[in-house]
Amino acid sequence: MPSYIVVGGQWGDEGKGSLIAYLALKDEPQIIARGGVGTNAGHSVFINGRKYAVRQLPTGFMQTKARLLVGAGVLVDPGVFFHELEHLKEFNVAERVGIDYRCAIIEPRHKERDRASSYLHDKIGTTGSGCGPANADRVMRMAKQAKDIKELEPYLTDVAQEINDALDEGKLVLIEGTQGFGLSLYYGTYPYVTSKDTTASAIASDVGIGPTRVDDVIVVFKSFPTRVGEGPFPTEMSAEEAERLGLVEYGTVTGRRRRVGWFDFEFARYSARLNGATMLAITMLDKYDKGAFGVTDYDKLPRKAKEFIEEIEERVGIPVGIIKTGPELEHVIDRRDTL
């Protein structure tokens, strides 16, 4: 599959980071590109027991053979960008990364407006990263672009051209989405959403490829969906129930405790349809069934875990190709060859 997109099927925090890291190392794509909103979404991955979190750069950074790209649709915060270059120095990221020269820039004034808005802070639950105000300025054609920032000059490129050239040459391209379907400005739980669309079609547009150039769309769901901030959550459980089940989590960017719910099959089916899913990935199966922890062979899954996967496939109507059974990169069941 020359190109594939990975997107979240719920409200973000589905575990896309660890899945993308696995795909980056397993499949060895020549290009790993990030779409999405900007620095309001964090992806975490564990490598040899150490946690790495990124908000700006592609999560597949550990694949040292890959070119890392940030698409034109993504907002760039220069401070975050350079911090991550330093944080990931051991992976030689600075020599492999390219930012599209058309990316809009998050400035300090955008973060100030974001944090000063009682509506965004109290009602919507903004992360305060400045993405909403920056996108508003972009729509009004007032935002600066990456090409206007001198410090970014060494990293500027035409991401769309690079990716399309790579596809013409038969190279493998992995494209990362951020956040999740339920936070889409168009299809999510408006107004409790992010500042742009988050579906696979939007992510393709972010990096500059047309729909006919996308070969596969992997939509990621976790066994117990979570949500940070305000907004409807039909299957939400009480905080006490989440604690009893050992499902206490905190947001990568905000540090706020995540709300937790039961798996919503109807929502998952709708999300998969609108994203054009060709395959599903299920993460944190070990939270649903502790006996699944670390299992790497589907046939060795406990009965409860296997029945859950089968129910998802039946009710959502899309095959489950990848299953994460723990936080480490090797905690995965890869069924893609059997589909």
Curated annotation (Swiss-Prot):
<keyword id="KW-0547">Nucleotide-binding</keyword>
<feature type="binding site" description="in other chain">
    <location>
        <position position="256"/>
    </location>
    <ligand>
        <name>IMP</name>
    </ligand>
</feature>
<dbReference type="GO" id="GO:0004019">
    <property type="term" value="F:adenylosuccinate synthase activity"/>
</dbReference>
<feature type="binding site" description="in other chain">
    <location>
        <position position="127"/>
    </location>
    <ligand>
        <name>IMP</name>
    </ligand>
</feature>
<dbReference type="InterPro" id="IPR018220">
    <property type="entry name" value="Adenylosuccin_syn_GTP-bd"/>
</dbReference>
<dbReference type="InterPro" id="IPR027417">
    <property type="entry name" value="P-loop_NTPase"/>
</dbReference>
<protein>
    <recommendedName>
        <fullName>Adenylosuccinate synthetase</fullName>
        <ecNumber>6.3.4.4</ecNumber>
    </recommendedName>
</protein>
<dbReference type="GO" id="GO:0005525">
    <property type="term" value="F:GTP binding"/>
</dbReference>
<feature type="binding site">
    <location>
        <begin position="324"/>
        <end position="326"/>
    </location>
    <ligand>
        <name>GTP</name>
    </ligand>
</feature>
<dbReference type="GO" id="GO:0000287">
    <property type="term" value="F:magnesium ion binding"/>
</dbReference>
<feature type="binding site">
    <location>
        <position position="258"/>
    </location>
    <ligand>
        <name>GTP</name>
    </ligand>
</feature>
<feature type="binding site">
    <location>
        <position position="141"/>
    </location>
    <ligand>
        <name>IMP</name>
    </ligand>
</feature>
<keyword id="KW-0460">Magnesium</keyword>
<comment type="pathway">
    <text>Purine metabolism; AMP biosynthesis via de novo pathway; AMP from IMP: step 1/2.</text>
</comment>
<feature type="binding site" description="in other chain">
    <location>
        <position position="194"/>
    </location>
    <ligand>
        <name>IMP</name>
    </ligand>
</feature>
<keyword id="KW-0342">GTP-binding</keyword>
<feature type="binding site">
    <location>
        <position position="42"/>
    </location>
    <ligand>
        <name>Mg(2+)</name>
    </ligand>
</feature>
<keyword id="KW-0479">Metal-binding</keyword>
<feature type="binding site" description="in other chain">
    <location>
        <position position="179"/>
    </location>
    <ligand>
        <name>IMP</name>
    </ligand>
</feature>
<comment type="similarity">
    <text>Belongs to the adenylosuccinate synthetase family.</text>
</comment>
<comment type="function">
    <text>Plays an important role in the de novo pathway of purine nucleotide biosynthesis. Catalyzes the first committed step in the biosynthesis of AMP from IMP.</text>
</comment>
<dbReference type="InterPro" id="IPR001114">
    <property type="entry name" value="Adenylosuccinate_synthetase"/>
</dbReference>
<feature type="binding site">
    <location>
        <begin position="12"/>
        <end position="18"/>
    </location>
    <ligand>
        <name>GTP</name>
    </ligand>
</feature>
<dbReference type="InterPro" id="IPR042111">
    <property type="entry name" value="Adenylosuccinate_synth_dom3"/>
</dbReference>
<keyword id="KW-0658">Purine biosynthesis</keyword>
<feature type="active site" description="Proton acceptor">
    <location>
        <position position="13"/>
    </location>
</feature>
<feature type="binding site">
    <location>
        <begin position="42"/>
        <end position="44"/>
    </location>
    <ligand>
        <name>GTP</name>
    </ligand>
</feature>
<dbReference type="GO" id="GO:0046040">
    <property type="term" value="P:IMP metabolic process"/>
</dbReference>
<comment type="subunit">
    <text>Homodimer.</text>
</comment>
<feature type="active site" description="Proton donor">
    <location>
        <position position="43"/>
    </location>
</feature>
<feature type="binding site">
    <location>
        <begin position="252"/>
        <end position="258"/>
    </location>
    <ligand>
        <name>substrate</name>
    </ligand>
</feature>
<feature type="binding site" description="in other chain">
    <location>
        <begin position="13"/>
        <end position="16"/>
    </location>
    <ligand>
        <name>IMP</name>
    </ligand>
</feature>
<keyword id="KW-0963">Cytoplasm</keyword>
<dbReference type="GO" id="GO:0044208">
    <property type="term" value="P:'de novo' AMP biosynthetic process"/>
</dbReference>
<dbReference type="Pfam" id="PF00709">
    <property type="entry name" value="Adenylsucc_synt"/>
</dbReference>
<feature type="binding site" description="in other chain">
    <location>
        <begin position="40"/>
        <end position="43"/>
    </location>
    <ligand>
        <name>IMP</name>
    </ligand>
</feature>
<feature type="binding site">
    <location>
        <position position="13"/>
    </location>
    <ligand>
        <name>Mg(2+)</name>
    </ligand>
</feature>
<dbReference type="InterPro" id="IPR042109">
    <property type="entry name" value="Adenylosuccinate_synth_dom1"/>
</dbReference>
<dbReference type="GO" id="GO:0005737">
    <property type="term" value="C:cytoplasm"/>
</dbReference>
<feature type="binding site">
    <location>
        <begin position="284"/>
        <end position="286"/>
    </location>
    <ligand>
        <name>GTP</name>
    </ligand>
</feature>
<keyword id="KW-0436">Ligase</keyword>
